[in-house]
């Protein structure tokens, strides 16, 4: 859990209007053109008595059509080409639901799910939520099931704590993430499921999380907050074409899952809302695709995890085979994409590409420390654009929160095989920070075609206990990243 914080209230309606109204998020082509023009203007302002080729790499990976690094298809969601048809389709109204925003529909949703579970092995089922405001506590999904929100449908999270029952802590965490013991269930929940779709016509799920945030701020929270959506020990999951607002805690949290697709999502929370990660797509999960999402939150936009200290190491369920692409967003206190800090089961084979992060604390961050154990390996980050990001690239220690006193300070993480290429950061505040661990240096870190603009001339990269190589970097990287000739760049 991050300690990211920033006080800024009343953001949601502004954000919703901006996303859903006439103002459109910029196309990738326009963003590409903007970065190219600004980069060229910056070049023209450089003192002409120096050779431009010595000062800054000319090939950003933005101008040409080819991309260094792994060549993968334009979509990683091929196994969900079409939402499956269901034999039984019912409306929440069929179970007594009233969409007036005031009447509790908790019993209606739970009755609906009990009914839908009958068709798990006989053609599946779909629950339609029509236009309206549907107040409800938590409810459990079933297998071979689709939750479909029509245009104008809004599911509202109950403000009654009793309608978010307590469930056991995850075994890879050993306790609730925020408090000892049990934790609150998520608003939309499932365990041991197969073939689950949560989709619609850009309907909305609003967790109404302010009640939960105030418990955290006031230090009166007794049990760990629930997520907006959590699926456990499940497979073949599609979350698609919806808006998620105001999660009490992490917004989307698949754990111990496989074959997960999260696409075309808008996820919003106030920038000061604590620990409202947008998507934690892989917590000890494998085969994950996240693409084409817009996120603004009070924590990481996307965070990859795999368990906490000795509990994660004991369970030893890694997160692997993960693709995150075409994610845009803002998090003034955290990172666009974070790996860790809970990564004790291991993280490997991650591709992150085509990210646009603005007005944020960090672009990409690897977070770990003594006690975590585990490993982070074979991470590829390619084609990333940033504006007004404080620290564009950050590998940092300082994950000094532990589940209990039994954590092992000798359990150090192993980090190696990190490839970062084709990165442009404008109006940066600080240079990259790369901090390994003395007894376990971060190895085989390679950076190519990385340009960080906006830094004062006296600002230098900060590196400690790392080793690797670099090619075409501006400004010059730290000496631990051995400089290679442009003609020997291994990614080319």
Named regions from a protein language model:
Residues 2-492:
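Extracellular/periplasmic carbohydrate-active domains that bind, remodel
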């Amino acid at each position: 859990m991050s300690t990211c914080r920033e006080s800024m209230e009343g953001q949601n309606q502004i954000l919703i209007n901006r996303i859903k109204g006439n103002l459109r998020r910029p196309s990738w082509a326009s963003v590409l053109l903007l970065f190219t023009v600004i980069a060229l203007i910056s070049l023209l302002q450089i003192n002409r008595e120096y050779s431009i080729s010595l000062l800054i790499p000319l090939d950003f990976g933005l101008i040409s059509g080819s991309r260094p690094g792994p060549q993968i298809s334009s979509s990683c969601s091929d196994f969900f080409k079409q939402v499956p048809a269901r034999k039984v389709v019912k409306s929440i109204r069929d179970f007594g639901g009233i969409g007036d925003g005031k009447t509790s529909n908790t019993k209606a949703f739970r009755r609906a799910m009990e009914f839908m579970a009958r068709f798990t092995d006989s053609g599946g089922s779909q629950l339609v939520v029509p236009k309206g405001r549907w107040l409800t506590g938590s409810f459990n999904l079933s297998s071979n099931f689709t939750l479909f929100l029509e245009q104008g449908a809004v599911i509202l999270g109950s403000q009654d704590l009793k309608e978010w029952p307590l469930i056991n802590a995850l075994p890879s965490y050993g306790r609730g993430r925020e408090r000892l013991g049990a934790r609150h269930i998520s608003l939309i929940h499932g365990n041991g499921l197969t073939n689950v779709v949560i989709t619609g016509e850009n309907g909305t799920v609003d967790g109404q999380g302010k009640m939960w945030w105030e418990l955290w701020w006031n230090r009166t929270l007794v049990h760990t907050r629930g997520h907006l959506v959590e699926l456990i020990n499940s497979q073949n999951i599609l979350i698609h074409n919806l808006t998620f607002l105001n999660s009490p805690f992490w917004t989307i949290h698949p754990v111990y899952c496989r074959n997960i697709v999260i696409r075309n999502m808008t996820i919003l929370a106030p920038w000061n809302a604590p620990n409202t990660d947008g998507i934690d797509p892989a917590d000890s999960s494998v085969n994950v695709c996240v693409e084409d999402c817009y996120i603004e939150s009070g924590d990481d936009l996307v965070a990859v995890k795999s368990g906490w200290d000795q509990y994660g190491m004991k369970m030893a369920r890694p997160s692997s085979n993960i693709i995150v692409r075409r994610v845009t967003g803002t998090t003034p206190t955290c990172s666009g994409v974070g790996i860790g800090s809970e990564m004790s089961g291991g993280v490997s084979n991650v591709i992150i590409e085509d990210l646009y992060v603005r007005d944020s604390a960090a672009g990409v961050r690897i977070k770990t420390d003594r006690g975590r154990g585990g490993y982070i390996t074979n991470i590829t980050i390619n084609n990333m654009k940033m504006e007004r990001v404080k620290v564009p690239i950050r590998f940092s220690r300082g994950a000094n929160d532990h589940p209990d006193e039994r954590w092992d300070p000798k359990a150090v993480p192993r980090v190696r095989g990190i490839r970062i290429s084709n990165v442009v950061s404008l109006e940066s505040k600080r240079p990259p920070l790369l901090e390994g661990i003395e007894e376990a240096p971060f190895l085989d870190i390679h950076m190519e075609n990385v340009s960080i603009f906006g830094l004062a001339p006296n600002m230098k990269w900060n590196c400690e206990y790392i080793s690797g190589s670099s090619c075409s970097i501006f400004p010059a990287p730290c000496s631990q990243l051995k400089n290679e000739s442009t003609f020997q760049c291994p990614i080319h």
